[in-house]
Curated annotation (Swiss-Prot):
EC code: 6.2.1.5
Record flagged with keyword Flavoprotein: no
Protein name as catalogued: Succinate--CoA ligase [ADP-forming] subunit beta
Organism: Gemmatimonas aurantiaca (strain DSM 14586 / JCM 11422 / NBRC 100505 / T-27)
Broad EC category: ligase
GO molecular function, one term: ATP binding
UniProtKB keywords: ATP-binding, Ligase, Magnesium, Metal-binding, Nucleotide-binding, Tricarboxylic acid cycle
InterPro entries found in the cross-reference section: ATP-grasp (IPR011761), ATP-grasp_succ-CoA_synth-type (IPR013650), ATP_grasp_subdomain_1 (IPR013815), Succ-CoA_synthase_bsu_CS (IPR017866), SUCC_ACL_C (IPR005811), Succ_CoA_ligase-like_bsu (IPR005809), Succinyl-CoA_synth-like (IPR016102)
GO cellular component: cytosol; succinate-CoA ligase complex
Obligatory cofactor(s): Mg(2+)
Length: 381
């Protein structure tokens, strides 16, 4: 679950991280009033779950309250990566002497949180990792002990030679770690961490991604979800208990099991196609899941072909076949469908599909190739 910048900053503030004052506005008049209240130059920042807000025109410097109103008028209602901006953060504009990056991710190999720190802040850390990896220090944290003071100081001195700044940075890293753990994050970052002309550190921007598996035990964090800033298809899928991530391709994928779903997407790319989504119907033998999956995928106008890839274990292939038949009878497909299934009750599934005008294959490679071919032709058989 993604948090907005203002939500992430509030969690950081509670943990003790120094944050510029700011408030949320949903109208230009509110933005102007907040700027007057802050009494200094401000930044007006679009609050949507999308990167590249600045490049899209969603982050503006405003020297006066009148400018804040003007920029908020332009930003509110604008679309950034298919998401409509409904609120802006009006925050004090920081004087910047230098910028650094401090972040924490989860390393799935070591099963530990890992700090990433770099003096090259203010830009995407992925870009730094690709072009100048020596500028990044990685530091895993043993969760039995947490981030120890000497570890934090080591990272602080990696960023700053000045002892005062290194100590400030070390303290902020410990506070960031506290926020990361208490909110159930998979990602938490401050970018940039700014040195002001007064030689003080302040977190100008913050990002947090919450592990969905943590939400049941953290209802106060789950309450921060903003479905209006999520893709409608992902909200629909979550309500239908489907694991779904929307992508930009044209091959709609319906698969059971996360591993097979990722392998299917890899094969689609291998054969020259682009997957339109990641969709895992899970191990349930519930035809309704297939009905919901088809409904969600067919709502995407970019999808030119639908690919089913089912390996029947716990999932019975005849239930999947019945789901396909039920869904297509209720809403006839406007794009071709390619079905690959094998495993539990395979013969019965093939019979059900054949009786209803569908053909299916047990070979994954040929099915994926056919789906890519059809999608490339724009859905024409």
């Amino acid at each position: 679950m993604n948090l907005h910048e203002y939500q992430a900053k509030e969690l950081l503030r509670v943990a003790g991280v120094p944050i510029p004052p700011g408030e949320i506005a949903t109208t230009p008049e509110q933005a102007e009033a907040i700027a007057k209240k802050l009494g200094t130059a401000v930044m007006v920042k679009a609050q949507v779950h999308a990167g590249g807000r600045g490049k899209a025109g969603g982050v503006k410097f405003c020297p006066t309250p009148e400018a804040a109103k003007e920029k908020a008028t332009a930003i509110l209602g604008m679309t950034i990566k298919d998401l409509t901006v409904e609120k802006v953060l009006v925050t004090v504009a920081a004087d910047i002497a230098s910028e650094a990056y401090v972040g924490i991710i989860v390393d799935r190999a070591t099963k530990k949180p890992v700090f990433m720190v770099s003096a090259a802040g203010g830009i995407d850390i992925e870009e730094v990792a690709a072009t100048t990896p020596e500028k990044i220090l990685y530091h895993p944290v043993d969760t039995r002990y947490g981030l120890l003071p000497f570890e934090a100081m080591r990272m602080g001195f990696f960023l700053y030679q000045d002892v005062k700044l290194a100590r400030q940075a070390a303290k902020i890293m410990q506070q960031l770690y506290t926020a990361f753990m208490s909110a159930g994050c998979s990602i938490a970052e401050i970018n940039p961490l700014v040195v002001t002309p007064q030689n003080e550190l302040i977190a100008v921007d913050g990002k947090m991604v919450i592990d969905d598996n943590e939400l049941d035990r953290l209802p106060q964090i789950a309450a921060l979800r903003d479905e209006s800033s999520e893709a409608p298809s992902e909200v629909d899928a979550r309500n239908a208990n489907l694991t779904f991530i929307k992508l930009d391709g044209n091959v709609g994928c319906v698969v059971n099991g996360a591993g097979l779903a990722m392998a299917t997407m890899d094969l689609v790319k291998y054969y020259g196609g682009d997957p339109a989504n990641f969709l895992d119907i899970g191990g349930s033998s519930n035809p309704e899941k297939v009905v919901n999956a088809l409904r969600i995928i067919t709502a995407d106008p970019n999808v030119k072909c639908i690919l089913f890839n089912i390996f029947g274990g716990i999932t019975r292939t005849d239930d999947v076949a019945n789901g396909i038949v039920t869904a297509t009878k209720a809403n006839p497909l406007k794009v071709p469908i390619v079905i690959r299934l094998t495993g539990t009750n395979e013969e019965l599934a093939l019979q059900i599909l054949k009786e209803n005008g569908f053909s299916a294959s047990s070979d994954m490679d040929s099915a994926v190739q056919r789906a890519v071919e059809l999608a490339t032709k724009g859905g024409a058989a």
